[in-house]
């Protein structure tokens, strides 16, 4: 069991800033070297959305971590670990005025099966992570960015040809899972990332 007390956690927030176009500098036409346009006092005010880092509120994080590992006599083994977290600074999707929530917090667990000898080893790993708040802002405007729950299956192995030569391979995301990012609710899709299955030798 663990408890973390967080203070002055840095979060990004967005606010609108106005800019008087009439106060801008002259635009020079590079082909002629003359002013292509001049500011006009009647120009409309331009509004820009600025993303700024701010000190967040205090928060408390409680959680449990558990890890188990066992190796059998024949070289096979298993490893499992998991984390469960809870915080008093979680995102409320119905509160559009909320300016603080801890980012990156979520439950997760990993399961690994392996086989090892003096000459070679192979590992199969399954990883799962629950959805979490990545950011309280979006590039498209107001609202949080949430990464939905994700699972991944990986494999790796190696063979020692000699004391100085080893052959290695690794396969990432064997089941070709997608990463989904959304806004406040599940129908607010922001991004689908397909990194595909990847191999390295």
Where are these regions (language model features)?
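Gram-negative outer-membrane beta-barrel transporters
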Residues: 2-3, 19, 24-137, 175
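C-terminal regions of RecA-like/P-loop NTPase motor modules
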Residues: 13-19
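Outer-membrane beta-barrel proteins
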Residues: 54-57, 144-147, 190-192
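Short, basic/aromatic-rich helical patch in the C-terminal catalytic core of site-specific tyrosine
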Residues: 66, 155-158
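Short, surface-exposed loop/helix-turn segments at secondary-structure junctions
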Residues: 136-145
């Amino acid at each position: 069991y663990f408890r973390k007390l967080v203070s002055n956690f840095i979060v990004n927030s967005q606010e609108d800033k106005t800019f008087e176009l009439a106060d801008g500098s002259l635009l020079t036409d590079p082909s002629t070297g003359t002013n292509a346009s001049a500011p006009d006092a009647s120009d409309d005010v331009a509004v820009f959305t600025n993303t700024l880092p701010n000190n967040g509120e205090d928060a408390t994080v409680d959680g449990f971590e558990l890890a188990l590992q066992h190796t059998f006599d024949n070289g096979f083994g298993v490893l499992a670990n998991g984390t469960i977290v809870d915080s008093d600074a979680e995102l409320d999707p119905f509160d559009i005025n909320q300016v603080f929530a801890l980012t990156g917090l979520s439950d997760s667990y990993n399961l690994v099966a392996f086989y090892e000898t003096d000459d070679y080893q192979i590992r199969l790993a399954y990883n799962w992570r629950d959805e979490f708040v990545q950011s309280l802002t979006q590039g498209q405007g107001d609202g949080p960015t949430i990464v939905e729950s994700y699972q991944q299956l990986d494999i790796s192995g190696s063979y020692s040809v000699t004391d100085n030569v080893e052959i290695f391979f690794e396969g990432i995301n064997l089941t070709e899972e997608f990463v989904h990012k959304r806004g406040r609710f599940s129908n607010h899709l922001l991004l689908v990332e397909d990194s595909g299955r990847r191999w390295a030798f």
